Swiss-Prot record:
It holds the Pfam family DUF1749. This is Esterase AN6793. It comes from Emericella nidulans (strain FGSC A4 / ATCC 38163 / CBS 112.46 / NRRL 194 / M139). Homodimer. Gene3D superfamilies: alpha/beta hydrolase.
């Protein structure tokens, strides 16, 4: 969970692509020529182009490889997350991947040999898991899809297959919010915060949609600002209930994918569906990187135990194991790995991503082994 983007560090060379109407993706590129393989990076709540600092390290490490890095702007980028949702995110990821596939036809590498890996940071990890585990195409949702509930509704697109998926800092928004409710914040006591959130939940449940479930309602800005969301960000009742997931763990919201108290049955319906959907092509194609010192994760969470449960749900059928060997906890890593105190942790993150991409590519003559991780 991260809702305040970092300031830009320095000018970054690359190409800006319009992959759909009014939606763009930035391709990090310091050299001419098409690279056949693609890492598509999806950032977290409040993030946008260039706001996740460690992405620069990944780009630098892959400079001499056959991989290019794309960072798309989607409807939920920056402040748009408050009225968007995972379904719309994955729709736009699908459109971006379709664009990239067509764009890279000129790379000289046959389509069957070109690789695409999706990587999510924070809430972007929810997008990644939803992309590879949900029905394809997904089911239409009220308030999110134009024409829902009407005869002439527009169906969500079919999502293209991907060769790999990376989740970095996959944390529970619900449990992060619960920590604030238990401790309060610099402005309000825990008692006041609990009242504000409970009132907001009651309002959102009572007034989730209007106009025959075709339009979202918006929670009053003073309420969401008191909780800690940016005062300028409108948050729909639908998205608020999804993030806070008040009926969890029995009936979790769409965004509640990574909480430590979720049942095995819930994990079978998310992680466990990866092997059934057929969207993630490669075995050993899922890399999960959990930060060892993430302030968004409550102290009571058993990180190692949580990862074991996720792996068990994903790889229950040992004949088709998707969990990659580089998955695990990055010791000492914070949520975003920003700052001078996180240099070693960023190196370790880049090393694991670098090794994973080399395995996905599978050709040592042209793979990431020709590039170099941070030294």
């Amino acid at each position: 969970m991260r809702i305040r983007p970092s300031p830009p560090k320095k000018p970054t060379p690359g190409l800006l692509h319009e992959y759909a109407d009014r939606l763009v993706a930035f391709e990090y590129s310091a050299s001419k020529g098409l690279k056949p393989h693609t890492l598509l990076f999806i950032s977290g709540l409040g993030d946008g182009l260039g706001t996740v600092a460690y992405l620069e390290d990944i780009v630098a490490a892959l400079e001499g490889s056959q991989w290019s890095v794309f960072s798309p702007v989607i409807s939920s980028s920056y402040g748009g997350w408050g009225t968007s949702g995972l379904g719309r995110d994955t729709d736009e990821m699908a459109r971006c991947i379709e664009y990239i596939q067509k764009y890279k036809e000129g790379s000289g590498v046959h389509e069957t040999e070109r690789k695409i890996v999706i990587m999510g940071h924070s809430t972007g990890s929810q997008d990644v898991l939803t992309y590879i585990s949900s029905p394809n195409p997904r089911h239409p949702q009220p308030g999110l899809d134009p024409g829902h509930g009407h005869r002439h509704k527009r169906m969500p697109p079919l999502r293209p297959q991907v060769d790999g998926a990376i989740m970095q800092a996959p944390v529970s928004d619900r449990q992060a919010i619960q920590t604030v409710l238990e401790e309060g914040n610099e402005r309000h006591s825990a008692k006041y915060m609990r009242k504000v959130v409970n009132d907001a939940i009651a309002y959102a449940k009572k007034h989730t949609y209007e106009d025959y479930d075709s339009l979202d309602t918006i929670i009053p800005l003073p309420i969401t600002a008191a909780i800690g969301y940016p005062a300028s960000t409108a948050v729909s009742s639908r998205r608020f209930l999804s993030l806070t997931s008040p009926d969890s763990p029995d009936s979790p919201g769409e965004d509640d994918l990574f909480s430590s108290d979720l049942t095995d049955e819930r994990l079978r319906k998310t992680f466990g569906m990866v092997r059934h959907r057929g969207v993630l092509k490669d075995q050993k194609g899922l890399l999960v990187l959990y930060s060892g010192n993430d302030p968004s994760v409550p102290a009571f969470v058993d990180k190692e135990g949580l990862l074991r449960r996720w792996r068990w749900a994903t790889d229950a059928d040992e004949k088709r194991a998707y969990w990659h060997g580089e998955s695990g906890i990055i010791p000492g890593a914070t949520h975003t790995l920003e700052g001078p105190g996180q240099v070693e942790q960023r190196k370790e993150l880049v090393r694991r991503v670098w090794m994973f991409l080399a395995d996905v590519e599978g050709d040592p003559r042209t793979s990431c082994h020709s590039a170099r991780p941070l030294s």
